[in-house]
Amino acid sequence: MNSSRSLLALALLFISFLVYQQWEIDKAPKPVVRETAVSQSDTPNSSSASTSAVDSQAKGRVITLQNDVFRLKVDTLGGDVIESELLNYAQELNGEERFTLLENKDGTTYVAQSGLVGKNGIDSAAGRADYQVNGDNFVLAEGQDELSVPFTFEKDGVIYRKIFMLKRGSYDIAVNYEIRNQSDETIEVQPYGQLKHTLVESSGSMAMPTYTGGAYSSSETNYKKYSFDDMKGANLSVNTKAGWVAVLQHYFVSAWIPNQDADNQLYTTTNNGMGFIGFRGPTVTVPAGATETVKTALWTGPKLQNQMGEVAEHLDLTVDYGWAWFIAKPLFALLTLIQSLVSNWGLAIIGVTLVVKAILYPLTKAQYTSMAKMRMLQPKLQEMRERFGDDRQRMSQEMMKLYKEEKVNPLGGCLPLLIQMPIFIALYWTFMEAVELRHAPFFGWIQDLSAQDPYYILPLLMGGSMFLLQKLSPTPVADPMQQKVMNFMPVIFTVFFLWFPAGLVLYWLVSNVITIIQQQLIYRGLEKKGLHSRKSK
């Protein structure tokens, strides 16, 4: 396989990847789910108070809770988190306004609801618990590692405390219930948590698609997306040990994590243009005079793999690298390591490219050596075609015999190509999913490596490097039509890369430059062995 055909094969693989990716987004089969087993009496769904009672704007007091990474707003009516402002992330590049994940304004609803339902639940069709809080604004103080804020509600001799606990440097919120039964009767309640989101379509383009929708984890499924279209098609109902539910968007996620030692039910429903994905825990029985505690957790923030993996098992899988995850994870670890040394994500990408090309160099050398040997055999192969042109079986036998005698692998030029494409796909998803690259500058005009080059300079340079690499490759294609196709390859790639993240284009550009250097070094060595001639280009 010569260089021109390698480039053509790479282009076909690349285009196939884009087409397959878009097909997955538009035509993915809907998950098979069970539509029963959800009790209408006490489960948070479209007909119960846990959703319908909070379909309007906040009606209670709004309490502010803040640590060093986010600012939350909690409605005292029900104790729902109606806003989360992420202090370390800007809404727009170089903007002063902070990124708001949870919000309930301007026609957009995305809130984290939770409460107690069941036989003696305080969240029902009749209304929500109206909690009392001693203050309006709570901020984690300097030198303090945790901030605990109790919301208190009393009914029929039972004191309910919904306690929000924020930790320094963490987007993980403990949302615990303390139920003190001072009545003469045994009571039963069930905890629930759900994310309520306006039903929207996933956005993005063919080059940079983004997913907005639900996801969940269960004992049988480590991670599965459940889109808003899925929710409209059928209600999810999954009984599981542990598990979690989430709503994903580009770079950010909110997730409810129930008690991981309990048997929980995960569910979805839709109502009045809203999608709900949540959990319902097991019934908690509190005898007269007793006190019980129920533990849940809420994550609302960026997709930080290391932190999320510590909060709940498989929550880090919301950073979705697709089928190339086994390559993407070590690449991201390497990228992070280099960035910690050079303090620039663009330089880190260049560093990763150098490492990848160094690892692949033996295969690259083998590829060019194989192609050089194939070129040396062309006169003999042409002679065989003339001798056995009408006898394809005999010609194939003679060709294989020749390859064996000359110790040439006719497919030797394919292996580096087949290895390089999965690495490219893994890097693509790394750049698409890693929130660390969001608004990460390189230098000059590249101020966001996760977005396309605003002036298209990098794609043009990449196209130029591909054109140069093609011209420096020996043995031009003889077929005129194939030659025309090859001449257009750099143009086609350049057009595709106009809308790709600048970080990915940077990788491809640097990779091409390194390939050109490696190519010339390899050719010099082959010249000494008589396997290459500069005149053959």
From Swiss-Prot:
Protein localization: Cell inner membrane
Alphabetical list of Gene3D superfamilies matching this protein: 2.70.98.90
GO cellular component assignments: plasma membrane
Signal peptide: none
Domain of life per record: Bacteria
Membrane topology: Multi-pass membrane protein
CDD domains: 5TM_YidC_Alb3, EcYidC-like_peri
InterPro entries: Membr_insert_YidC, Membr_insert_YidC_N, YidC/ALB3/OXA1/COX18, YidC/Oxa/ALB_C, YidC_ALB_C, YidC_periplasmic_sf
Chief location: membrane
Ranges that cross the membrane: 6-26, 341-363, 411-431, 449-469, 490-510
Keywords assigned: Cell inner membrane, Cell membrane, Chaperone, Membrane, Protein transport, Transmembrane, Transmembrane helix, Transport
An example Gene Ontology biological process: protein insertion into membrane
GO molecular function, one term: membrane insertase activity
Pfam families: 60KD_IMP (PF02096), YidC_periplas (PF14849)
Quaternary structure note: Interacts with the Sec translocase complex via SecD. Specifically interacts with transmembrane segments of nascent integral membrane proteins during membrane integration.
Matching PANTHER family: CYTOCHROME C OXIDASE ASSEMBLY PROTEIN COX18, MITOCHONDRIAL, OXA1
Function recorded in the entry: Required for the insertion and/or proper folding and/or complex formation of integral membrane proteins into the membrane. Involved in integration of membrane proteins that insert both dependently and independently of the Sec translocase complex, as well as at least some lipoproteins. Aids folding of multispanning membrane proteins.
Family, as annotated: Belongs to the OXA1/ALB3/YidC family. Type 1 subfamily.
Protein name: Membrane protein insertase YidC
UniProt organism field: Actinobacillus succinogenes (strain ATCC 55618 / DSM 22257 / CCUG 43843 / 130Z)
Record lineage: Bacteria, Pseudomonadati, Pseudomonadota, Gammaproteobacteria, Pasteurellales
